[in-house]
Amino acid sequence: MLFRLYGLLLLVIALSGCAEPPYSNLDNEQLETMLGRGVPIYDIRRAEEWHQTGVIEGSRLQTFVDDSGRVLPDFLAHLSRTVDKDDPVILICRTGNRTSTLARHLTEHMGYTQVYNVRNGITRWIGDDRPVTRL
């Protein structure tokens, strides 16, 4: 099952440049607006990344892939239990690559309707001197 999911995600990556994404990309100003409205943000990086850079205050920390790039088996099930498919959800990673893959999968294959990807991830957030909380 995990192998099939990983294969599916690789296919999504390969095809992602072919069309407009089915999710919305956010810049930092748009992200601040969404956070101000109470939209949850999921930081899908690994624990060592959270400790290295810090996280946006209020982020829900849930690792998507291990250090070998394998999708963690419980990730999608946990997300399905915590986020309704019609509720907005923001995804952030280091540079926006992992989250764009995940956002596409959530919208195209799992029926999520309001998925937001933070373009350029936490790297741009920090580069723009935005605040982070250290773990």
Residue spans for each PLM region:
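Structural scaffold elements adjacent to functional motifs in cytosolic proteins
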Residues: 41-43
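Rhodanese-like catalytic fold shared by cysteine-dependent sulfurtransferases
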Residues: 2-6, 18-37, 47-88, 97-135
